[in-house]
């Protein structure tokens, strides 16, 4: 049996991986090596990023604790004497802003970055409770700590203040040493929370960045694996690109129907798109004298050729088990590899599945694969026009193909034509034809 090892060369600008053939180990070992290298790269990258993150966060923490003098305190009290007294006690440690009413306080909060609010409860026009309620319901100020200033000690009032979001109470007449201690403590707490928020923002950004990199790496690996099988047959050209786009437009159309609206989410459709190139990965295990035979296959040869569906699924299963990389992508790839030659009426292979027992991903791939084979030149046939291919596909309605997939194809046939032309093989192995144009000959 002729098999092939691979060397992968990735174009950094396109993330498309190309295959070079070499003498070979087993297919599942190739898959395992690729998935293992992928996982190793991820592990090293994450370890490096966590070390960098710890260094950055430690630096941020120490710098932040040393820099509380840059914090701004807003004192809100209707008494000018109280404002002057507290300002004098805090001004040498922090920046101070003051307001004699709740309305002015809210205006200051809307214009300036404030780190902590000292808020009198009993004020004319607008009480401290009303002010804190607005502060805590504004996403731009809800994180600012508020310390209530009050001339009376009442447990019910204190409970209400804490329920509204206050972090502390300071009783009048105010003790400056006590006030400084409370302010310093809550500024430290706020700065720690700010650091955590910054850390979370950093992590979210880093996760998104790394996820994007891993998605692109995964796409490159998938296309590399698929290309492994395609390099066995020099006539397949851009078959992988065309069929994955056919599958995508079919899935997007079915997603508008009642039956599949809740099944075909954008994420699922993207997984179908990425897994589609692996549909014929099992062909790497088919001998060249059968795979590339220009004439009709004998019954025994056809039996061997049919094995590629099972070989593909088994190779993916083996790689999945060895690498521990169980993902939606691999699961869909197994469905497509195993099921894209099944037929709606149960006459397909390898399991003879019927109707909805055939995975939807495989039903979409079945039509995409047949359509592309019909419109492309092969060693045993000339390319058909779109209309000729369409006629054959329509003949398979309810027998070869899912009727709903046929309906989607009819609606999207101009997109099929556009995809075929966009990803046409370099040697013009397809017949260019516009929708409705009649085939010649």
Swiss-Prot record:
CDD domains assigned to the protein according to its UniProt record, in alphabetical order:
HDc, REC_PA4781-like
The protein's enzyme class: hydrolase
Domain (Response regulatory) ranges: 72-187
- Keyword terms: c-di-GMP, Hydrolase, Phosphoprotein
Where in the sequence is 4-aspartylphosphate found? 120
Describe its function.
Probable phosphodiesterase (PDE) that catalyzes the hydrolysis of cyclic diguanylate (c-di-GMP). Increases motility and decreases biofilm formation in vivo.
- Please give the PANTHER family that the UniProt record associates with this protein: CYCLIC DI-GMP PHOSPHODIESTERASE TM_0186-RELATED, CYCLIC DI-GMP PHOSPHODIESTERASE VC_1348-RELATED
Q: Which GO terms describe its molecular function?
A: phosphoric diester hydrolase activity
Q: What is this protein called?
A: Probable cyclic di-GMP phosphodiesterase VC_1348
What is this protein's expression induced by? Transcripts are more abundant in biofilm cells than in planktonic cells.
Gene Ontology biological process: phosphorelay signal transduction system
The catalysed reaction is: 3',3'-c-di-GMP + 2 H2O = 2 GMP + 2 H(+)
Q: Name one Pfam family in it.
A: Response_reg
Q: Which InterPro entries match?
A: CheY-like_superfamily, Cyclic_di-GMP/3'3'-cGAMP_PDE, HD/PDEase_dom, HD_GYP_dom, Sig_transdc_resp-reg_receiver
Per the database record, which ranges form the HD-GYP domain? 214-425
EC number, as in UniProt: 3.1.4.-
